[in-house]
Amino acid sequence: MSTSAKHTSAPDSFFSASLEQADPEIAAAIKGELGRQRHEVELIASENIVSRAVLEAQGSVMTNKYAEGYPGARYYGGCEFVDVAENLAIERAKKLFGAGFANVQPNSGSQMNQAVFLALLQPGDTFMGLDLAAGGHLTHGATVNMSGKWFKPVHYTVRREDGIIDMDAVAKLAEETRPKLIIAGGSAYSRAWDFKRFREIADSVGAYFMVDMAHFAGLVAGGAHASPVPHAHVCTTTTHKSLRGPRGGLILTNDEALAKKFNSAIFPGLQGGPLMHVIAAKAVAFKEALQPDFKVYAKNVVENAKALAETLRAAGFDLVSGGTDNHLMLVDLRPKGLKGNVSEKALVRAAITCNKNGIPFDPEKPFVTSGLRLGTPAATTRGFGVAEFQQVGNLIAEVLNAIAQSPDGAAPLVEASVKQRVKELTDRFPIYQ
């Protein structure tokens, strides 16, 4: 009997063709994105640059495996190796943050926060979080988000005069509203959080205390930021941003009973099969963050942020709260007569990537804004130090001052000049060679 007949639906190239061969359009888009990352200064506070090892793990054959459930208790066979990966991720996360329990399965930051809500609240329950307009996050009760539609959010904010959270006002609001959950953390707050006081306030009204440390978890892991883990009932974080891992979420707690609730909330409550290739990449990133050089990295992120903030202040720019204690800052553009959207576009043309951002009590709409959010994790990863961030701060000031004098929000000659100097700077700090 002949065995030459083909009995497979896969083409001969299925297991051998490169991306360039199989899909040149997507390959071109990826190549273009690599070029952008190589030649632009990345200042978006929520972005970072992962290691080649993280990329390799995330692009591995673990993408093929379904593994509903948890290690040792799966609903599918053949999970012995993905169990190894997930157990490593769990144990490394626990060690990294000094937590008793960790769930590494959340696919995103939004889903990790939804899981906490599912575990601790009922629809219609009251909870407290920082107002989005003051630097909070969509999942902390924004009206357009599930958290604002299914639950009853009440928001604390910052003082108008200095842009800092008034803890006495937080305590008063908690006493008046008696929330079941109080959230600390946000996406655009540049100052330190008083976790001890927040826990005291939560205890005084019988509320759970949650910290969403998605933005500053890498600083916590590296010892450059106070840890909320000893104070909070639960901490959530994304695994990218300052933690420098793949995109995903993580839930931490020291309470075994709550850990069981969070596990059930993730699976089967919100998710089915976890993304095992991403979990493998999380494990790699956690191992990297456990190394001594990550402490140096975290320290440098904060030092670089302070240097960038001081450079901008010296150049005549106003910063919300006057500066930063972490990795990010908000530039108030109103004294310059500028809008966030126009400023963002001008800086992008000059190869400096950042994002427009609302500032506290912002009169502008979200797609316009009166501010810019700047962060230092990504450029610090590629090797920038204080001197480079001082240079970047001066380049930002050069572009913004130029467009402030322009009737159409553009300054082509200045933007082109800055772009060339950015290229010279980034060429000194190559990535993925």
Curated annotation (Swiss-Prot):
Q: Which residues carry this modification: N6-(pyridoxal phosphate)lysine?
A: 241
What is the catalytic activity of this protein? Answer: (6R)-5,10-methylene-5,6,7,8-tetrahydrofolate + glycine + H2O = (6S)-5,6,7,8-tetrahydrofolate + L-serine
According to its UniProt record, the EC number is 2.1.2.1
Q: Which UniProt keywords apply?
A: Amino-acid biosynthesis, Cytoplasm, One-carbon metabolism, Pyridoxal phosphate, Transferase
Quote the Gene3D superfamilies the UniProt record gives.
Aspartate Aminotransferase, domain 1 (3.90.1150.10), Type I PLP-dependent aspartate aminotransferase-like (Major domain) (3.40.640.10)
Q: What class of enzyme is it?
A: transferase
Q: Name one GO molecular function term.
A: glycine hydroxymethyltransferase activity
Q: Which GO terms describe its biological process?
A: glycine biosynthetic process from serine; tetrahydrofolate interconversion
> Which positions bind (6S)-5,6,7,8-tetrahydrofolate?
132, 136-138
Named in its record, the pathway it takes part in is: One-carbon metabolism; tetrahydrofolate interconversion; Amino-acid biosynthesis; glycine biosynthesis; glycine from L-serine: step 1/1
* Positions marked as site (Plays an important role in substrate specificity): 240
Q: Name one Pfam family in it.
A: SHMT
What subcellular locations does the record give?
Cytoplasm
Q: What cofactor does this one take?
A: pyridoxal 5'-phosphate
Q: Give an example GO cellular component term for this record.
A: cytosol
NCBIfam families, from UniProt?
PRK00011.1
Q: How does it assemble?
A: Homodimer.
- HAMAP family, sorted: SHMT
**Entry's family note:** Belongs to the SHMT family.
> What function does the entry list?
Catalyzes the reversible interconversion of serine and glycine with tetrahydrofolate (THF) serving as the one-carbon carrier. This reaction serves as the major source of one-carbon groups required for the biosynthesis of purines, thymidylate, methionine, and other important biomolecules. Also exhibits THF-independent aldolase activity toward beta-hydroxyamino acids, producing glycine and aldehydes, via a retro-aldol mechanism.
Record protein name field: Serine hydroxymethyltransferase
Question: Which species?
Answer: Rhodopseudomonas palustris (strain HaA2)
